[in-house]
Design a protein with these regions (language model features):
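Alpha/beta-hydrolase active-site loop
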Residues: 105-124
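The alpha/beta-hydrolase serine catalytic core
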Residues: 7, 13-18, 24-28, 38, ...
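Short beta-to-alpha linker loops that shape the active-site pocket of alpha/beta-hydrolase fold enzymes
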Residues: 67, 93-98, 169, 263
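Conserved alpha/beta-hydrolase
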Residues: 80-101
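Primarily recognizes the serine-hydrolase "nucleophile elbow" in alpha/beta-hydrolase
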Residues: 120-181
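The serine-hydrolase catalytic nucleophile loop
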Residues: 67-80
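A short loop-to-beta-strand scaffold at the N-terminal edge of the catalytic core in hydrolase folds
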Residues: 33-53
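Short beta-strand element of the alpha/beta-hydrolase
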Residues: 57-66
């Protein structure tokens, strides 16, 4: 499966433009360009009530979770709670995850899910959008940033102003670690997809990619001049350090690489690192 990067994102059915709505949480279903319903949550910034934080009402983080995550997972909510100290946060469950419709394509058509969430965030009145993705979500934010450019016709409401990719792969079909071999079994085997559905609440599409989408490392050169931060753990059990280094090399001068003392994705990222990411995004998003 692949996507047609042309075409617009279908908006949520909620009326989002009221300033009052930006002060209260919202939960709704968005509709992607290919008709999938996406469970989505808006959390207003906590510093509306917290005088110690700088005012940045126009900044919103759009968080893309990892494979088998969803908006209600505790590790996703912890990320949200930290980022609300720097701006509003939109989270969503990728297709095939949680209460969202469809089936997971493990990073291919998920760019449409992210585009719908970014468009919704802008519709709520936020003028600066930082996308932050973890693991599979980290690959999605990279591909999304390359496909949805500020100057491209039809994509001006779905582009990111800053991009943070945490624990992302650089290339597809990597099986060099035991966790990735297990993941490939989940995705490619009927028995694995049953385990994923009933054990991890993740419904995976049975079809192979056709054509194979552009890989993260192939996408990165198309992100410039949008600021890019690549974050990776030195103890990541899924993707070794050659992955972030490949991404950083592809980014050149417009990318920044942080190698951190941690493992993989949302479960491993600490509050101090999330604070630094929040600071970086607030500055980089302009």
């Amino acid at each position: 499966m692949s996507i047609d990067p042309a075409g617009r994102v279908v908006r949520s059915t909620v009326s989002p433009h009221s300033e009052t709505r930006r002060h209260a949480p919202i939960r709704t279903f968005l509709h992607t360009d290919d008709g999938v319903t996406i469970d989505s949550v808006y959390d207003p910034p906590s510093f509306v009530y917290e005088a110690s934080r700088p005012l940045a009402r126009d900044l919103v983080f759009v968080v893309a979770h990892g494979f088998t995550g969803d908006v209600d997972r505790p590790h996703v909510r912890r990320v949200v709670n930290t980022f609300t100290r720097y701006g509003a946060v939109v989270t969503f469950s990728f297709r095939g995850h949680g209460a969202s419709g469809g089936r997971s394509t493990v990073g291919d058509r998920e760019v449409l899910d992210l585009a719908a969430a970014v468009s919704w965030a802008r519709g709520l009145g936020h003028t600066r959008v930082a996308t932050v993705g973890f693991s599979m979500g980290g690959s999605v934010v990279l591909r999304h940033a390359a496909l949805y450019r500020p100057e491209a016709d039809g994509h001006t409401d779905a582009h990111a102003d800053a991009v943070v990719s945490v624990s992302a792969p650089a290339r597809w079909y990597y099986r060099g670690t035991a966790p990735m071999r297990r993941l490939h079994w989940l995705v490619t085997r009927p028995a694995g997809r049953l385990v994923s559905r009933y054990g991890f609440r993740t419904r995976i599409h049975h079809r192979d990619w056709d054509p194979v989408p552009l890989s993260p490392v192939e996408s990165v050169p198309g992100i410039a001049p949008t600021p890019l931060l690549i974050v990776h753990g030195d103890r990541d059990g899924y993707f070794p350090l050659d992955h972030p280094r490949m991404l950083a090399e592809a980014a050149g001068d417009h990318g920044e690489l942080w190698i951190e003392p941690m493992g993989h994705a949302e479960h491993a990222v600490g509050d101090e690192l999330l604070d630094r990411i929040g600071d970086w995004a607030g500055t980089a998003a302009g």
